[in-house]
Curated annotation (Swiss-Prot):
Protein name according to UniProt: Acylcarnitine hydrolase
Cell compartments where the protein resides: Microsome; Endoplasmic reticulum
Superkingdom of origin organism: Eukaryota
Tissue expression summary: Expressed in liver, stomach and kidney.
Annotated GO MF terms: acylcarnitine hydrolase activity; all-trans-retinyl-palmitate hydrolase, all-trans-retinol forming activity; carboxylic ester hydrolase activity; retinyl-palmitate esterase activity
Pfam families to which the protein is assigned, alphabetical: COesterase
Signal peptide per UniProt: 1-26
Keyword entries, A-Z: Disulfide bond, Endoplasmic reticulum, Hydrolase, Lipid metabolism, Microsome, Signal
Higher taxonomy: Eukaryota, Metazoa, Chordata, Craniata, Vertebrata
Broad class of enzyme this protein falls into: hydrolase
Protein's job: Hydrolase with high activity towards palmitoylcarnitine. Is also active with p-nitrophenylacetate and alpha-naphthylacetate. May also hydrolyze retinyl esters.
Entry's EC annotation: 3.1.1.28, 3.1.1.-
Family, per entry: Belongs to the type-B carboxylesterase/lipase family.
């Protein structure tokens, strides 16, 4: 299942990224510079030429939206940025937040890691990037799309969201934000000494900054759409249900990530805080002492602790998340904003198993070890061990073919982690505001020779299509069919940002998700279908909980005897 990038594609990718990092798209001259005023000072951006177009884009990079979260502000809510005098340079990519970029090795992106190693890393990382069409000015009132990057809440940076082409082609403003990651972003003691969710609070601060300042860049603060993939989608979904984010945005796009993703939300902070306390060597008997000890650690020491976490959950902190996301959704305690919610066909194909360290388990799966693997899997899902048999019956059937078992296991994990949570959130939200649901089905041509033939769309495969062939600031080569798919997807996303509805003349019609359960299959030939994974949804939301209830009842009766 390990994914190796084809050399020709990788070379093009790395060369493209290198060009961006040394920033040579446009000539830095007085004529191409641009100055905008924010509430804390002036910033000079740059007019760049967007490749493959005749258009220009103004880029403003590394604008601070909060104070550096260091010293006493480590494990504390973000504070407003300090004003500056003179004109701040906004032509260099900001330092990324502290993170373990060695994770890129684990997903087969070693060469990319080498390039990214040249980008500075710092705790002082609460910055955002802005991309605007060259003609945009105060009063343009263009729709705004705020990109929240993914990366399991432990890795990523604003520069992953290269909004150049999207801004120019669709005449809107794109903002890409950074937020604290890993332990620095989500450590919690579960009490007033460190409530947690610092990364989410950073995102709220960035959205407030957008409300205050985006008009100076040609954006409309009353037409803000937040969007993201994976943990970015989870972030977007969490803002929909958080009282702290109310009024800061008007539309939400969640790509393969919602607030119910099991690995990114936890009722309790205990597991993470115990691990952090143990690894840090802070022999603290209480929360206050532990937080004081952790604040005294160097960035390098924090990075060592971070390496243990392949992902890190947000917590129910009583403030950003007053209750568990499922409770907030079920009690209709959320902002009724229009949403696009979607998943990919093969969410657990390639990238996620490598991150989670399960690729080898899948590769070695056979009828002989299936029962043991499913028992372990059930335990990881926090299900009773007896549920392993139910999972086998639902997904594996009676087949002995190892390849079929591996495919079915991957489908099961993709459903549990991504598809079922997305459908649940869509069903909760649709009675209060329009929800447009999609399944991205296209197998990217540039992975044709490196993935199994049955695989269509892996986790995050849609991202380059949304940004017009750009991903992580790199350019991928599309076929003509893929260029059309990308243009359509950019148009759907931009229409939604403009009007809260993705449809317009010349696009295949995308129906709203109502009781007909219609959704759009996003491929080179888009099509409308009904009731995505209806049987699997029934299994996870009705059959399995009922069985668990029966098991608990039987155990209770047995205990009473």
């Amino acid at each position: 299942m390990a994914r190796k990038q084809p050399h020709s594609w990788l070379n093009a990718v790395l060369f493209g990224l290198l060009l961006i990092l040394i920033h040579v798209w446009g000539q830095d001259s007085p004529e191409s510079s641009s100055i905008r005023t924010t509430h804390t000072g002036q910033v000079r951006g740059k007019l760049d030429h967007v490749r493959d177009t005749k258009a220009g884009v103004h880029t403003f990079l590394g604008i601070p939206f909060a104070k550096a979260p260091v010293g006493p502000l480590r494990f504390a809510p973000p504070e407003d940025p300090e004003p500056w005098s003179g004109v701040r340079d906004g032509t260099s990519h900001p330092a990324m937040c502290l993170q373990n970029i060695d994770m890129l090795d684990e997903v087969g992106l070693t060469d990319m890691k080498m390039i990214l190693s040249s980008i500075p890393m710092s705790e002082d990382c609460l910055y955002l990037n802005i991309y605007t069409p060259a003609h945009a000015h105060e009063g343009s009132n263009l729709p705004v799309m705020v990109c929240i990057h993914g990366g399991a809440l432990v890795i990523g940076m604003a520069s992953m969201c290269d909004g150049s082409l999207l801004a120019v082609n669709e005449d809107l403003v794109v903002v890409a934000i950074q937020y604290r990651l890993g332990v620095l972003g989500f450590f919690s003691t579960g009490d007033e000494h460190a409530r947690g969710n610092w990364g989410y609070l950073d995102q709220v601060a960035a959205l407030r900054w957008v409300q205050q300042n985006i008009a100076h860049f040609g954006g409309n603060p009353n037409r803000v759409t937040i969007f993201g993939v994976s943990a970015g989608g989870t972030s977007v979904s969490s803002h929909v249900i958080s009282p702290m984010s109310q009024g800061l945005f008007h539309g939400a796009i969640m790509e393969s990530g919602v607030a119910l993703l099991p690995d990114l939300i936890s009722e309790t902070s205990e597991t993470v805080s115990t691990t952090v306390a143990k690894l840090s060597g802070c022999e603290a008997t209480d929360s206050e002492t532990l937080v004081r000890c952790l604040r005294a650690k160097s960035g390098a020491e924090i990075l060592v602790i971070n390496k243990v976490f392949k992902m890190i959950p947000a917590v129910v902190d009583g403030e950003f998340l007053p209750r568990h996301p499922k409770e907030l959704l079920a009690s209709e305690d959320f902002h009724p904003v229009p949403s696009i919610i979607g998943v990919n066909t093969d969410e657990y194909c390639c990238t996620i198993p490598m991150v989670m360290g399960t690729a080898q388990i899948i590769k070695e799966l056979s009828r002989e070890n299936l029962q043991a693997v499913l028992k372990d899997t059930a335990a990881q899902m926090m299900l009773p061990p007896e549920c392993g048999d139910l999972l086998m019956e639902e997904y594996m059937g009676n087949t002995d073919d190892p390849q079929t078992l591996q495919i079915q296991y991957a489908e099961m994990m993709g459903d549990f982690l991504f598809v079922i949570p997305a459908l649940q959130v869509a069903h909760f939200q649709r009675s209060h505001a329009p929800v447009y649901f999609y399944e991205f089905q296209h197998a990217p041509s540039y992975f044709k020779n490196v993935r199994p033939p049955h695989v269509k769309a892996d986790h995050a495969d849609e991202v380059p299509f949304v940004f017009g062939s750009f991903f992580w600031g790199i350019k991928v080569d599309f076929t003509e069919e893929e260029k059309l798919l990308s243009r359509r997807m950019m148009k759907y996303w931009a229409n939604f940002a403009r009007h809260g509805n993705p449809n317009s003349e010349g696009l295949p019609y995308w129906p709203v998700l109502d009781h007909d359960e219609q959704y759009l299959q996003l491929d080179t030939q888009p099509a409308v279908d009904r009731a995505l994974k209806a049987r699997r949804l029934q299994f996870w939301t009705k059959t399995l909980p009922q069985k668990i209830q029966e098991l608990n009842g039987a155990q209770k009766n047995h205990a009473e005897l």
